[in-house]
């Protein structure tokens, strides 16, 4: 890219991150300064929400750039949780954006040490057959980041013990959508637990559903009884 194109692309990413922060508040997935958002810029750096800022007050110029080597650029310091954002983006080339929230039901479950098991087929939208819960570690610590990587593995979401939830995606829209889905699943699972014994789906069925989700909503989704006849009837 030329210098002008690179600058424009960076501006668009910052604007998208600001919009995502505000959307988290609008969707009631976070409150005050809790939680954080990041979006990949390139193979060695990413933009991340600034530390200690109320989401409704974040401006484009507040969004710092952070390199994987720990150097940051901008007028506001990066979120205190920068370590797990960096380590996840570095470990997972398929991930373009990360959302961390303290949404009510997901956090409540995390405070019991529970994850979200295969009680509903939508759990597989994370790319795995369960949503695991990482053990508690102090926020912002390398220990927490290490626990997150060990827990999330190939999934796109996990809970954080006594803390909150992480959701990831190819872009900010996907990460936001998944954060909302995890919160919805957490609420449903909490309600199911209150009703009594919860029936679980087996691993074979969950992996089958996870595979279907890989092409869900796409024109080339696999369905033996459907064939695409063209763009117009």
Language-model segments: what does each one mean?
Residues 1-233:
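Glycine-rich flexible loops
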